[in-house]
Design a protein with these regions (language model features):
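A cross-family detector of function-defining hotspots
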Residues: 127, 135-136
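A short acidic, often aromatic-flanked loop/helix-cap motif at beta-alpha or helix-coil junctions
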Residues: 45-47, 127-130
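Short Pro/Gly-enriched beta-strand edge/turn motifs at strand-loop
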Residues: 44-51, 117-121
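Glyoxalase I/VOC metalloenzyme domain signal
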Residues: 1-12, 16-38, 53-119, 132, ...
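Conserved catalytic-core motifs of GNAT/GCN5-like acyltransferases
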Residues: 38-42, 122-127
Length: 168
C-alpha cells in the first residue's frame, strides 16, 4: 500500500476558520500576546489561480498570519464564494480546519498524494512577488479526521494589507 510520505514532515501551520478575522486577531494579541499579524486578501489579483474540485472558481478570503513559537497560525475568514472553508463551517462550525505542511516541490508532493489515494479539494497559487507560491488542500479528512494542506512557500511575499498591532 502506498503512503503519503509528506506526512513525515513537520507541521508548519495550523489553520483556523473564523467568523471575524479582525476580532479573532485582537483576542489572540490581547489574551495571549501573539502578534504581529499580517493580513492578506486571498483573491485575484493576489491569487493568480483558484480551483475547487479541479474547476476554476472565484473566492475571497481574509487571511491573518501570525506565529505561536515556530508554528504559523493562519486565521481564515471566508468573505465570498463556495470553498473548503464554507464546507467546513457547514459540517463543523468554526475552528481548526487544517494542518499545513511545507513542501519544497508542490508537483512532487501532489504526485505523492495521488499515489497514496488523495486528491486536491481546493488550491490556489501565484501569490508570491515572483508569481510563485502554491497551496493545495487534500481530501485527508476521511482518513485523518483533519484536512492537510500542502504549502510551497513563495520566495518573496507581497507586503501585507495591514499588520496588527500597527507599527508605532
Amino acid at each position: 500500500m502506498a503512503y503519503a510520505s509528506f506526512l513525515n514532515r513537520s507541521i508548519g501551520q495550523i489553520g483556523y476558520v473564523v467568523e471575524n478575522v479582525e476580532e479573532t486577531v485582537k483576542g489572540y494579541y490581547e489574551k495571549f500576546g501573539i502578534g504581529n499579524w499580517h493580513f492578506y486578501t486571498y483573491a485575484p489579483p493576489l491569487l493568480k489561480f483558484q480551483n475547487y474540485y479541479g474547476k476554476p472558481i472565484y473566492y475571497n478570503a481574509r487571511i491573518a498570519l501570525g506565529y505561536f513559537g515556530d508554528t504559523r497560525i493562519e486565521l481564515i475568514q471566508n468573505v465570498e464564494g463556495q470553498t473548503i472553508y464554507t464546507d467546513f463551517i457547514k459540517s463543523h462550525g468554526y475552528g481548526v480546519q487544517h494542518l499545513g505542511i511545507y513542501v519544497p516541490d508542490m508537483g512532487e508532493a501532489l504526485r505523492d498524494a495521488a499515489t497514496a489515494g488523495y486528491s486536491v479539494v481546493m488550491e490556489g497559487g501565484g501569490f508570491g512577488l515572483d508569481g510563485d507560491g502554491h497551496f493545495a488542500y487534500l481530501d485527508t479528512e476521511k482518513d485523518c479526521d483533519i484536512t492537510y494542506e500542502l504549502i510551497q512557500r513563495p520566495k518573496r511575499r507581497h507586503e501585507p494589507d495591514m499588520i496588527y498591532p500597527a507599527k508605532a
